[in-house]
Amino acid sequence: MAAYESAKAEPKSTPKSGIDSNSWRWLCVKYFSESPDFKALDDRTQYVRRRILESTFDEPIAPGASRFYRDFPLSRMTVEAIEVLRDRKAAKPAAANARVKAIRQVFKWGVRKKSADGRPYAPSNPAREASYIKTHSTGYHSWTPEEVRRFEERHRVGTKARLALALLLFTGQRRSDITRLGRQNLRNGRITFTQYKGRKRNPTQLTLPIIPALQRIIDASPCGELTFLVNDLHRPFTDAGFGNKFRQWCNEAGLKNCSAHGLRKAGAAIAADNGATTKQLMAIFGWSSSKMADYYTRGADQKRLAESAMHMLGAEEQSEAETGPTKRPGGTFWDKN
């Protein structure tokens, strides 16, 4: 805390470039232009991370202070200083944690990157010790069967909206994938593609069977030449454009809480409930680790086990209903509770 307080009081000295050397903004600019890890991110992730980091530049070091985080010396960037930035987003824990995550990545790169004199760009990674804000949010709302039915009733087979729903639900892929899928991906009843997310760092190619329900909707729908889904100008959707359009379709069906990503969650839950294993879920959804798949199989296993065992809670009551209550001191278990 002493280093943070000292940095707040330190006089400002800005070089002609407009960016203080060895300052927080200086390190971020270096990260954007020199980090292979940053360049390997997909365009959308780069954009989001840049926005998160740049949003810290104009944060005052303290309320009412004339100095800002952009000029904060790296040597004085402490855990406390980073947690101040985190806590300013505390009303939205996901945004607060995204700040910490992005700052960690910058310092992680900075401590490894050496300048011409052999010194690292950043003396340490204080963000590593900054904790995340605990949140009980489960993220995007997972669609219920009733919500899927309402969407289908509003958007009949043959519409772009219904085709979008089918592609999302029956492939289990992200919007960044389904906006790029087209007939060129189809062969012998299967669809083959490389997932868009992570394609630069860890490309994942999937081959999925096309279930009959999806094939029927594709055959009955207006499709573009390069992609199944096209916008009103008959061009492939951008990711953001599709997100906005799908939001409109959900609103038209009265589904204010539903989103495209929520269908991916619903698909994983449905598959797990129907008995899909961790490995099977990883194969469908393209997850490289079992973390997400285990989340869904644990939930499905809990429901199945409870279903098979719940009758045991009533075993004594059922027995006494058939033979009469057992006479014992103090009455039956159910009398006591």
PLM-predicted stretches and their roles:
Residues 9-12, 29-93, 106-109:
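Basic/aromatic-enriched alpha-helical hairpins
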Residues 38, 142, 195-199, 278, ...:
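Catalytic-site neighborhood detector that most strongly recognizes the C-terminal catalytic loop/helix
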Residues 93, 97-101, 112, 122-175, ...:
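Basic, Lys/Arg- and aromatic-enriched nucleic-acid-binding interface segment
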Residues 129-131, 135, 141, 145-149, ...:
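Conserved tyrosine-mediated DNA breakage-rejoining catalytic core shared by Y-recombinases
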Residues 153-161, 171, 223-227, 234-235, ...:
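Short, basic (Lys/Arg/His-rich) helix/loop patches that form interaction surfaces
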Residues 184-190, 256-257, 276-295, 325-332, ...:
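Short, polar N-cap/turn motifs at the start of nucleic acid-interacting alpha helices
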Residues 198-219, 225-248:
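C-terminal catalytic core of Y-nucleophile DNA break-rejoin enzymes
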Residues 199, 232-233, 291, 310-337:
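C-terminal secondary-structure termini that scaffold catalytic or DNA-interacting sites
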